[in-house]
């Protein structure tokens, strides 16, 4: 799958400078910000994967409407993600395979100043797991982070027993840096996380090999 010229992508907008929707491409996947009309597809995938995903995610608030069942809540979620993109705090994308919604990949917690870093988070439909789609999506947004957003470092934090997610890092050859104890509260438990790091220097050194394997 070929990509449009990446220099036209505006890092803080849902559209490019030419007015076209923001889309990023790998060999087999496309990623773009979710919009209100994605509700049915997003809701179906989230419901079908409830058990698969819940053990790796924070507990949902009982006091807020569930965006997987409430269209207005989903629309508000999209608006909030757009606002975060506009302010440069995070960049959220839906993953699409042959036009069908399959998961999400996000650049979260963007810090500028001396750090110039962000954290990548992701999830995928269990029916699509094991086919390297997520490795491709992580590389697509890493390229965007380094080349369009000008970030210096990306970090990915994974619960040690989440072997599927750690396999994503292994396929891309992203460095394991160590263990952060009781790092995030996941499903009601303060979980240790393995921290992985990927810097722009590593991206430049491995650009040709990674692009040929995953992007071109």
List the predicted regions and their residue ranges.
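Short, contiguous, well-ordered secondary-structure segments
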Residues: 105, 110, 134-138, 142-144, ...
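Conserved GNAT acetyl-CoA-binding A-motif
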Residues: 147-157
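A short coil/beta-turn micro-motif at the C-terminal edge
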Residues: 36, 160-162
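GNAT-family acyltransferases
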Residues: 1-127, 190-216
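Conserved acetyl-CoA-binding loop-helix of GNAT-fold acetyltransferases
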Residues: 122-124, 130-147, 163-171
């Amino acid at each position: 799958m070929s990509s449009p010229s990446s220099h036209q992508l505006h890092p803080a907008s849902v559209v490019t400078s030419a007015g076209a929707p923001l889309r990023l491409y790998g060999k087999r996947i496309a990623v773009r910000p979710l919009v209100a009309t994605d509700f049915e597809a997003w809701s179906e995938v989230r419901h079908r994967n409830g058990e698969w995903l819940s053990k790796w995610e924070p507990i949902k608030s009982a006091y807020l409407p569930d965006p997987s069942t409430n269209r207005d809540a989903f629309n508000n979620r999209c608006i909030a993600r757009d606002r975060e993109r506009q302010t440069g705090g995070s960049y959220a994308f839906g993953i699409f395979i042959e036009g069908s919604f399959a998961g999400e990949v996000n650049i979260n917690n963007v810090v500028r100043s001396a750090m110039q870093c962000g954290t990548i988070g992701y999830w995928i439909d269990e029916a699509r797991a094991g086919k390297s789609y997520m490795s491709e999506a992580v590389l697509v947004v890493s390229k965007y982070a380094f080349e369009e957003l000008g970030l210096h470092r990306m970090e990915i934090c994974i619960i040690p027993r989440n072997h599927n997610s750690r396999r994503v890092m292994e396929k891309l050859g992203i460095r394991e840096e160590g263990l952060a104890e009781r790092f995030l509260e996941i499903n009601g438990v303060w979980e240790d996380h393995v921290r992985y790091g990927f810097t722009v220097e590593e991206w430049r050194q491995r650009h040709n090999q990674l692009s040929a394997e995953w992007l071109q």
